Amino acid sequence: MIARGEVGGRRRRPQWVVLWILLLGVAGSVLVFLGPGLAGGLRVEGSSLLAGPECTLETAEGDVGLDRDEAKLATTAVALRLRGLEAPDTTGIDAAVLQQLTDGPAGDAGPNLSCRGSAASDLEEQELTGSGLTSRAEEVRAAMTEVFGDQSLGGFAPGGIGQGHGGESTHYDGRAIDIFFRPVTEDNRRQGWILSHWLVAHAEDLDIQYVIFDDEFWSAHLSRGGWHHYEAPAPGNEILRHLDHVHVDVLGGSPG
């Protein structure tokens, strides 16, 4: 109990100190009661005040927290094993996590892994390379090829492209790649989500800005992460809704 007078010759604590201690105790009790979900969601100017896991895997038993290195390792291992190739050592990761990433949500294809967003602010604007992509976008393509092998790609061309996409499309800047999974079937959608999860897990390393697939999008500009509904422009067909392809683009940077 806080002393109401001098104890052992010490002066009485100022009233504001007593009130501050009481408020801290109340705040701590509230956080314990409401759980880690609230603590993980508190942000100050884009930073985590009480940080939760960097990445979250949704399972039937509840959410599983992963750090970014675990998410990168797990998504890479899943992709390589599905190709019948040797995967990196995943001893420190629960086998159930790997199985959940492989199978995806029960019932229908969809997202079950997300990571917090983080967008670098010190990047310089880049010119097109010979492929029609910027160097950052080329790094994404090379990294995908290393893990997923040859894919059906589009949305860029040598010299750049100037039509076929929305007016402000990052495709015109050479910053975007489309990876096709046609026709639109549940199996192809599940394959698309395996790639999408891998991209999100590696987004910080590769300066990825957006991943769009299957009516959903992830953004590096949203610090809390998560997948969000993508509102496709009219006429809202399979292409515009990104049902038949994963769209990934990289951060643009500022003029040097």
PLM features: residue spans?
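Extended, low-complexity, intrinsically disordered C-terminal regulatory tails
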Residues: 65-106, 130-166, 212, 219-222
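Catalytic cores and adjacent binding grooves of peptidoglycan-active enzymes
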Residues: 183-256
